[in-house]
């Protein structure tokens, strides 16, 4: 072959140049030989912690989305096809027509779920049968007692006392009497127990050795007696060998055989003993009777040769006798006539049986002991250090009232959200100009907030999911969270009401309860339903929710930011029994999806954007500052130190991604059902979770009280690692299409455990821990029916989650010394619970009737004592709470319930995916799952846009509304168009007059916007203006009447609410003091209503300020305008029509219905919501939370404030003009109301103050709202 030039064109190489990485190789023209690639270096150091060792996990629910590297289709087909085939094989006796006609399983999925349930029960029965056979039947099968040479039947030679052997059986002579040669026999039984004294009895061939009949050989005919000293006796001293003789002398047969070891047979004390087929023969009588060899006797020759030549072989003559036919025929006669005992041996069957028992003893005891000692270690050395405050660091705490750099909502130079650090290529010049027009006050690109700014108190969001809980339970939970030892500026209460539902026996719906506990922030106006993608299939994929924002003030001395998300459902499901209800997992995903989209700057739903605005306004920082999420159920009371303790755990170890505290029972003694749960709750935390926490692998964080890490900082403090918001986690946890029974048990029943399983599969190197210093209390089921329903869900979800967790190969440890093996043992133990308790009671009864006589027999009893006794010892060592020992005794009495009744019921209801009796809803007959729903998918109807796109649309909408307002004021003036200059308002501006409000460059009319492009997003953007500061005071206005003024006290108002608006009684009572009151009011009242309003209100009476009430400063114009800007109600002077114009003369006070009334309006045919901006009348006014919390800001009060000359104070928006007689009043928080408009109870510590209640017409001419008389009478 000819040589080839190295620099020929076809010899160009793409080998990468040495020493340079990430470099694209190019052809090299060189005379030098091509460079070799870098040598491969094998470095195995620390490979157990290298990230590349972790294998990517296949998605559990939807393997087709496994991503690159997976053969998803083949994996899914292989994984589910064999299970389907197995379920069909097991249930071959139940064809589909039979299931459809007899069992009511009409659809294919229900029949398949039933088949899978039967298959799982079949597997559980097989496992239970296997465990039962190992425990009770293995020894009987492999080592039967009839032919067993088990050590259990032996009395070993030389052991025990007062025992002698007769024909191989052990006889007790301790109580013997009248025994010949008694001193010698007692001495022999003491010095060498078990010695053979058969030669002292007269033996009959027909009775003792029937195999020797008809044989004349010397070995068969010999019947001589030999004394203890070896001399041949003429007569046998003990008489015939019979039961009568034993009874005469008081010798007791122990029914145990005399056992010899090989070392005993080889010793000098047994020189004339040999072994034949496992039987020890005492040949001393034969040799004494025949001292010389017998000629032509083959058997005699074999005996003498074996005794003389094979002492080192233990004198085993079995092979010698089986090689000759004559000696083989003599074996049976010899073993019957000269037997002295048996070789203490074990058969192969007995060996295998004992090996299995010993292995089970070692494994189970090892697990029990390791769990015990690890739990004690955790309680003594780890728990306190884990929950202690983090080490002093260089963190510089950020002042809560200082907005950090980058927290302001703005568009940065790259066009992305301010918290997104990823730089993009520079956009085109036109796009830059459009973006610059939407820039706000902070256009610079903010740096990410470092760990030194946040300090040791990270931002925590407290997720409270509510479904059918009552007001007391929800209020207790929120109060406990608010009163925790954690700054209100660093925690946010995030309440999600799962649908428009009312709990069983409750008079108020759950959303109304949640909203009534909120002191709404008036800046947000009336919430409107926002769309989002829910966890459901079909038509229920599209859902809507309203976001109420404000503060929780029921806690003593606290004012905690709070957000209430009410899932109200789409308009088309308003007629359903539970509009908006999608389950607890969907409520959790609202928060998880929100923070995921914030973290990744991903596209947001309208609900996400609304949440972003309100959370940012309440907290003063953008939501990306939140690092931790505390998930609490709505019936849980958190201890004051718990949140801080869990936060300390997270801050001390950045590898912790989840932590839970101890859950205690609040209603311990309510019933016997609650009493049997006390110890079960205690031991599940302080033993199971404590042991798992040592290795950082807690397999279940309870949903009632757990903290998760939203994202973790990298060690370099320059980037984040998403944890609970990682796409792999949220995608797995938000699956809505589930088809198999296994998937439905994972997602529909045990969402809390499944979330833990998903996190462990995704982050096997991170930790899940238990923090015993963090505690909470919750109410457990108090009836057996409720307990049965709850444990059915828990047991079934536990089995299916452990089935997935046992396949995770990256958990700590290896083989039997790994968390994977512990998970497997937990799975096996859960599956065999029914057979375990049955075997336990069988074992107890058996040992009571027949106590164990050996160590092997006592092995099952030792396991039982260890399993039951170790937790009791753990109580004393770890917690030193002796009272739990008493609770343990109650628990042991209920073991049949825990280990038999509940598991059997759960196994047979594998295909029941409802919540049963745990959460009952008023008027609901039977619960169903949230997953399947007919109809086409509606999730595509939800718009998804990036934050910057939503923000541009909001700013443009705000400019359009400001432009429209300015146009209206040019036409009608700054007042109202039905007022005139003679109404007494000195600050009134006529139509066309210049405005008293200063101009704003940001709202310039010259700004060009695309109305068509942005108007379509108007319904998805709230019409409020969160940039306004909150009102500093509740303003109470007096209302003037044309001729006479009346003073209304608080008691009079309460009577009015009860009896209606017939005020003749107290009008007459207060008439005498009217004149003096007029003078006082005229001196104190700086503002007065217009003439039109005064004439309008004089028809029904009104309120005046109390005689001794201090003067109220006027409200700044910028505060009084928020109702119009928000579009929170009808125009102040009347109702709007379809053209956007106002109809004067019809004054009406109106509020927005509460969440419960919103569903009723939709059912009644109310129009769907239109743009919430200033303009035509909206079907949504102020909510019940807003109307009560800021009643003075309702439409009517806004009208009086505007006509009272509030514009005069616009130039001084942050200052109130001093009053001549009274000093300015301090700020007062808004008072919440209960849904329906009734005033709520004031917060703790709040006194009864004068109300800012305003009057309204008793009639309702339009029918679109309700008067106060209609609402409160």
UniProtKB/Swiss-Prot annotation:
A Pfam family it matches: CHS4
Biased composition (Pro residues): 1215-1232
GO biological process: cell wall organization; chitin biosynthetic process
Induction: Expression is down-regulated in the mycelium and shows a maximal expression in the log phase at about 14-18 h of incubation. Shows a late increase in transcription at the stationary phase in both yeast and mycelial cells. Highly expressed during the stage of white tumors of plant infection.
Family matches, as InterPro entries: Chitin_synth (IPR004835), CHS4-like_dom (IPR054295), Nucleotide-diphossugar_trans (IPR029044)
Membrane topology label: Multi-pass membrane protein
A molecular function GO annotation: chitin synthase activity
Reactions this protein catalyses: [(1->4)-N-acetyl-beta-D-glucosaminyl](n) + UDP-N-acetyl-alpha-D-glucosamine = [(1->4)-N-acetyl-beta-D-glucosaminyl](n+1) + UDP + H(+)
EC numbers on record: 2.4.1.16
Gene Ontology CC, one term: cell septum
Subcellular location: Cell membrane; Cytoplasmic vesicle membrane
Superkingdom assignment: Eukaryota
Extracellular membrane side: 101-117, 382-820, 879-881
Low complexity bias locations: 1000-1009, 1233-1246
Keywords: Cell membrane, Cell wall biogenesis/degradation, Cytoplasmic vesicle, Glycoprotein, Glycosyltransferase, Membrane, Transferase, Transmembrane, Transmembrane helix
Positions of glycan attachment: 412, 667, 796
Cytoplasmic topological segments: 1-79, 139-360, 842-857, 903-1273
Family membership noted in the UniProt record: Belongs to the chitin synthase family. Class IV subfamily.
Biological function: Polymerizes chitin, a structural polymer of the cell wall and septum, by transferring the sugar moiety of UDP-GlcNAc to the non-reducing end of the growing chitin polymer.
Protein name: Chitin synthase 7
Protein source organism: Mycosarcoma maydis
């Amino acid at each position: 072959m000819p040589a080839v030039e190295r620099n020929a064109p076809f010899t160009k190489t793409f080998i990468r140049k040495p020493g340079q990485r990430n470099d694209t190789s190019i052809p090299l023209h060189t005379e030098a030989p091509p460079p070799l690639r870098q040598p491969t270096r094998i470095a195995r150091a620390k490979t157990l912690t290298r990230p590349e060792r972790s294998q990517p996990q296949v998605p559990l629910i939807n393997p087709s989305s496994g991503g690159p590297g997976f053969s998803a289709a083949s994996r899914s087909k292989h994984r589910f096809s064999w299970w389907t085939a197995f379920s069909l094989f097991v249930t071959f006796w139940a064809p589909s027509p039979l299931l459809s006609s007899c069992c009511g399983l009409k659809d294919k999925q229900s029949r398949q779920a039933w088949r899978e349930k039967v298959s799982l029960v079949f597997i559980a029965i097989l496992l239970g049968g296997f465990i039962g056979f190992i425990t009770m039947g293995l020894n009987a099968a492999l080592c039967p007692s009839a032919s067993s040479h088990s050590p259990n039947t032996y009395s070993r030679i030389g052991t025990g006392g007062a025992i002698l052997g007769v024909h191989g059986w052990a006889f007790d002579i301790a109580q013997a009497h009248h025994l010949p040669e008694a001193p010698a026999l007692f001495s022999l039984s003491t010095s060498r127990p078990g010695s053979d004294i058969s030669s002292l009895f007269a033996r009959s061939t027909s009775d003792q050795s029937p195999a020797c009949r008809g044989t004349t050989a010397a070995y068969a005919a010999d019947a001589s007696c030999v004394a203890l000293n070896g001399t041949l006796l003429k007569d046998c001293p003990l008489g015939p060998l019979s039961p009568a003789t034993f009874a005469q002398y008081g010798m007791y047969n122990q029914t145990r055989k005399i056992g010899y070891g090989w070392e005993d047979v080889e010793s000098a004390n047994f020189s004339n003993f040999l072994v034949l087929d496992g039987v020890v023969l005492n040949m001393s009588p034969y040799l004494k009777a025949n001292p010389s060899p017998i000629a032509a006797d083959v058997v005699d020759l074999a005996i003498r040769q074996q005794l003389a030549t094979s002492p080192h072989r233990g004198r085993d003559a079995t092979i010698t006798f089986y090689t000759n036919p004559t000696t083989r025929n003599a074996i049976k006669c010899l073993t019957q006539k000269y037997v002295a005992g048996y070789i203490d041996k074990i058969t192969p069957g007995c060996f295998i049986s004992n090996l299995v028992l010993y292995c089970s003893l070692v494994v189970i005891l090892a697990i029990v002991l390791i769990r015990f000692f690890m739990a004690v270690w955790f309680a003594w050395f780890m728990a306190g250090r884990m929950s202690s405050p983090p080490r002093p660091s260089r963190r510089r705490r950020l002042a809560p009232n200082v907005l950090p750099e980058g927290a302001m909502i703005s568009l940065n130079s790259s066009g992305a959200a301010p918290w997104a650090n990823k730089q993009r290529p520079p956009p085109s010049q036109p796009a830059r100009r459009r973006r610059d027009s939407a820039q706000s006050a902070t256009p610079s690109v903010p740096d990410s907030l470092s760990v030194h700014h946040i300090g040791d108190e990270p931002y925590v969001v407290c997720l409270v999911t509510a479904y059918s809980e009552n007001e007391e339970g929800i209020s207790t939970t929120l109060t406990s969270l608010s009163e925790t030892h954690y700054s209100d500026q660093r925690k946010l209460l995030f309440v999600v009401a799962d649908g428009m539902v009312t709990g069983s026996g409750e008079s108020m719906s759950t959303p109304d309860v949640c909203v009534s506990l909120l002191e709404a922030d008036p800046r947000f106006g009336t919430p409107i339903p926002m769309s989002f993608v829910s966890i459901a299939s079909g038509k229920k994929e599209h859902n809507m929710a309203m976001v109420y924002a404000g503060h929780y003030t029921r806690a003593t001395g606290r004012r905690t930011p709070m957000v209430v998300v009410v899932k109200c459902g789409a308009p088309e499901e308003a007629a359903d029994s539970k509009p908006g209800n999608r389950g607890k997992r969907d409520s959790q995903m609202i928060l998880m999806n929100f923070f995921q989209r914030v973290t990744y700057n991903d596209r947001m739903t309208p609900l996400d954007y609304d949440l972003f605005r309100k959370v940012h306004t309440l907290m003063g920082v953008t939501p990306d500052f939140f690092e931790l999420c505390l998930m609490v159920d709505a019936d849980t009371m958190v201890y004051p130190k718990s949140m801080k303790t869990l936060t300390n755990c997270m801050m001390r170890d950045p590898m912790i991604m989840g932590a839970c505290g101890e859950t205690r029972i609040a209603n311990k003694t309510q019933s016997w059902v609650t009493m049997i749960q006390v110890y079960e709750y205690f031991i599940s935390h302080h033993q199971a979770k404590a042991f798992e926490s040592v290795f950082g692998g807690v397999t279940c964080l309870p949903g009632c009280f757990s903290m998760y890490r939203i994202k973790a900082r990298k060690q370099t403090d320059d980037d984040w690692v998403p944890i609970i918001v990682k796409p792999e986690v949220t995608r797995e946890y938000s699956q809505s299409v589930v088809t198999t029974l296994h998937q439905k048990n994972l997602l529909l029943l045990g969402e809390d455990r499944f979330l833990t399983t998903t996190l462990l599969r995704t982050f096997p190197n991170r930790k899940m821990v238990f923090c015993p210093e963090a505690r909470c209390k919750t109410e457990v089921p108090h009836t057996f029916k409720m307990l049965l329903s709850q444990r059915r869900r828990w047991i079934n979800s536990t089995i299916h989650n452990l089935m997935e967790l046992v396949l995770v190969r990256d958990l700590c440890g290896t083989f039997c010394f790994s968390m994977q093996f512990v998970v497997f043992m937990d799975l096996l133990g859960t599956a065999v619970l029914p057979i375990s308790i049955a075997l336990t009671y069988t074992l107890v009864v058996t040992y009571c009737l027949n106590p164990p006589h050996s160590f092997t027999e006592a092995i099952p009893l030792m396991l039982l004592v260890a399993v039951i006794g170790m937790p009791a010892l753990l109580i004393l060592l770890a917690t030193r709470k002796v009272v739990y020992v008493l609770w343990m005794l109650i628990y042991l009495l209920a073991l049949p319930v825990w280990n038999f009744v509940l598991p059997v019921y759960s196994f047979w209801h594998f295909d029941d995916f409802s919540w049963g009796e745990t959460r009952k809803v008023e008027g609901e007959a039977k619960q169903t799952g949230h997953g399947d729903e007919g109809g086409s998918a509606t999730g595509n109807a939800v718009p998804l846009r990036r934050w910057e796109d939503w923000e541009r649309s909001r700013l443009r909408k705000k400019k359009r509304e400001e432009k429209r307002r300015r146009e209206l004021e040019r036409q009608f003036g700054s007042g109202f168009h039905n007022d005139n200059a003679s109404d007494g308002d000195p600050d009134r501006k006529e139509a066309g007059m210049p405005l008293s409000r200063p101009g704003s460059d940001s709202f310039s009319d010259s700004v060009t916007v695309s109305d068509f492009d942005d108007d379509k997003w108007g319904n998805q953007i709230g019409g409020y203006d969160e940039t306004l500061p909150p009102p500093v005071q509740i303003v109470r206005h007096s209302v003037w009447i044309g001729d006479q003024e009346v003073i209304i006290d608080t008691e009079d108002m309460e009577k009015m609410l009860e009896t209606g608006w017939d005020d003749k009684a107290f009008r007459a009572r207060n008439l005498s003091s009217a004149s003096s009151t007029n003078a006082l009011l005229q001196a104190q009242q700086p503002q007065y209503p217009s003439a039109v309003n005064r004439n309008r209100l004089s028809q029904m009476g009104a309120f005046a300020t109390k005689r001794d009430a201090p003067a109220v400063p006027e409200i700044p114009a910028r505060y009084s305008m928020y109702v119009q800007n928000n579009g929170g109600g009808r125009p102040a002077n009347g109702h709007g029509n379809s053209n956007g114009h106002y109809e004067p003369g019809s004054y009406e006070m109106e509020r927005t219905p509460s969440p419960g009334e919103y569903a009723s309006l939709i059912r009644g045919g109310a129009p769907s919501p239109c743009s919430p901006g200033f303009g035509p009348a909206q079907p949504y006014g102020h909510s019940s939370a807003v109307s009560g919390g800021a009643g003075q800001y309702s439409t009517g009060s806004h009208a009086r404030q505007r006509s009272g000359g509030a514009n005069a104070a616009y130039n001084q928006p942050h200052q109130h003009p001093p009053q001549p007689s009274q000093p300015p009043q301090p700020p007062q928080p808004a008072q919440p109301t209960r849904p329906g408009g009734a005033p709520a109870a004031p917060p703790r510590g709040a006194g009864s103050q004068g109300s800012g209640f305003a009057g309204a017409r008793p009639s309702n001419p339009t029918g679109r709202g309700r008067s106060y008389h209609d609402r409160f009478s």
